[in-house]
Amino acid sequence: MSLSPTQFRKAMGCFATGVTIITLDLDGEVHGMTANAFASVSLDPMLVLVCVDQSARTHDHLHAKKRFGINILGEHQRVISEYYARPVRAHEHAEEEAGARFDRTAQGTPILNGALAYLECRLKSAEDAGDHTIFIAEVEDVVVREGEPLLFFQGKYRQLGEDAPE
């Protein structure tokens, strides 16, 4: 039996994930991309990973800048996720129309207003893995807010439902 990329993608779609936007500063401008291949790696030291397609515009910027934010989206931020998932932005003020507004950390890293949580990260290592790169970063600061997460499952955005039966 030969496994197709479509079958693999369908199987991976059965794993529900949260949705993040990776943000970084490029000469005073916010650059970002939607990512759901994100995970905690270690508590001591506090490490996370994010996987980025090597053809994505953000890929080379992460290598060069070394400092970035991971914004964990709330259920009300689907439009923002869709905007940052596009490979090409519509026009200069489209991010504001999508509802994306940013503050800055003391180090200048963009923080998405209203995100459920935010992690400020410094790149520790990068490992090529197929057509993606696994970026491992040390978490230097976090902000956590109340709310429900935006989820992604079987190719669609979702919200939390009821608790699973015991």
Predicted regions and their residues:
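Basic, polyanion-binding surface patches
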Residues: 1-166
